Amino acid sequence: MAIKTPKEIVKILNEYIIGQDEAKKSVAIALYNRYRRMQLSKQMQHEITPKNLLMAGPTGVGKTEIARRLASIVEAPFVKVEATKFTEVGYVGRDVESMVRDLVGEAVRMEEKDQFARVKPQATKEANKQLVRLLAPGVKREKRENQMQQMQDMMSMLMGGANPNNQNNDQEEVTDEVRNERMDVAEKLNKGLLEDREVTIEVEQAPKANPMSDMMGQMGMDMGSMLNDIMPKKKVKRTLSVRDAREVLIQEESRKMVDYDTIYQRAIERSQNNGIIFIDEIDKIIAGNKRNSGEVSREGVQRDVLPIVEGSTVNTKYGPVSTDHILFIAAGAFAESKPSDLIPELQGRFPIRVELNALTKDDFVKILKDPQNSLLKQYIALMKADGIKLIFTQEAVDKIAQIAFDVNQGTDNIGARRLSTILEKLLEDVLYEGPDMEMGEITITEAYVEEKLHDIIMNKDLTKFIL
């Protein structure tokens, strides 16, 4: 993937996020500095650490979206965690190291996807060969087992493996007739003529969730994976269309072709050098003026987070992971506190401070119309599925934006999220009646917005509950 300059990164962010230019500029610089670091000598690379960011601003102004889009631009492993989910060591709750384990898990998923894409052509060939054999099976002949084989089958059952009686204990004989039939099936398969035909395949049974595995995972161990590697794989039969069966078989063949040790190693490197951890609601772990046991625990969480942010090694089931060069982005509303209320050591680990501004009416107008995935474009696409062309006049858009701004000012300010609740209420009848409407076009005007939302806006109690 081509390296993008800070200006190019900001330009991409502008396609999805309105305003907040200072925040976009700061994260773009932090991201590009990673590329600069990789061009230096190994010794200098080790010395240069990421400049972590602390974003302060009301809810719904784009803090999370900036970080999420940033990660997608460079295809970096990204996890979002909430600071309130963590507890001090010794208390019930998630330990802070779990954020690093989650990051590595995401990196493994990304690396596995990349490797699967690399081997997909060969895996597809093997999957098609299996489909041909299933659609044109050979002549079955009973396989004679010697006494030693019977003993091995019995031991397999005792160890938890599949019952030999349920397995395919027949030998397949491929006659000339079967061979010709398979050639015919292969030709039809390549032309896509058998996609809807059903076929029965054997697939590995997914391991059941085990609470003990989760507990072991928090200690960097995965007993479930260890046992799955030792114990025989159980298989179940599933009847699927050829189209769906091919995808399942491609996945199974891909797993056989890739080297998971390499995947895990690359995932760890990817996490260490490119990983982004977004810590939301960091203001909620600031202790208040009145100290009690709960407040002490909040400060304890800060002290537990500190070594992760400043650089340490965390044991995961894929191997030890260094957090020295992971980029941390913390965010919070700081409505009842300020960043300087964090413990001094943690403040020092977030040297770049960015304040995000509350959204104005003009911002709401742009949010409704400009982004690639804007809310109006989403509703227009939904109605298009019913064969209806949905049109919003500029006056209607201005009115919706004004209502969102006024409701935020009069009640709790939830930023751009207010637009979703307003639009859902505004278009409730249209969405309900849509499939039965015969008209090909619906225009949302300012008068329609007034009619649908006027009574709710005038009644403050209804506004709080509905909008």
Curated annotation (Swiss-Prot):
Q: Which SMART domains match?
A: AAA (SM00382), ClpB_D2-small (SM01086)
Q: Does the keyword DNA-binding apply?
A: no
In this chain, ATP is annotated as bound at 18, 60-65, 280, 345, 417
- What does the annotation say about its assembly with partners? A double ring-shaped homohexamer of HslV is capped on each side by a ring-shaped HslU homohexamer. The assembly of the HslU/HslV complex is dependent on binding of ATP.
Record keyword Ligase present:
no
In the record, the note on similarity to other proteins reads: Belongs to the ClpX chaperone family. HslU subfamily.
Q: What is this protein called?
A: ATP-dependent protease ATPase subunit HslU
The UniProt keywords, alphabetically, are:
ATP-binding, Chaperone, Cytoplasm, Nucleotide-binding
Q: Which organism is it from?
A: Lactobacillus helveticus (strain DPC 4571)
**Classification via InterPro entries:** AAA+_ATPase, ATP-dep_Clp_protease_ClpX, ATPase_AAA_core, Clp_ATPase_C, HslU, P-loop_NTPase
Tell me, in a sentence or two, what this protein's role is.
ATPase subunit of a proteasome-like degradation complex; this subunit has chaperone activity. The binding of ATP and its subsequent hydrolysis by HslU are essential for unfolding of protein substrates subsequently hydrolyzed by HslV. HslU recognizes the N-terminal part of its protein substrates and unfolds these before they are guided to HslV for hydrolysis.
Q: Name one GO cellular component term.
A: HslUV protease complex
Listed as disulfide-bonded, the cysteine pairs are none
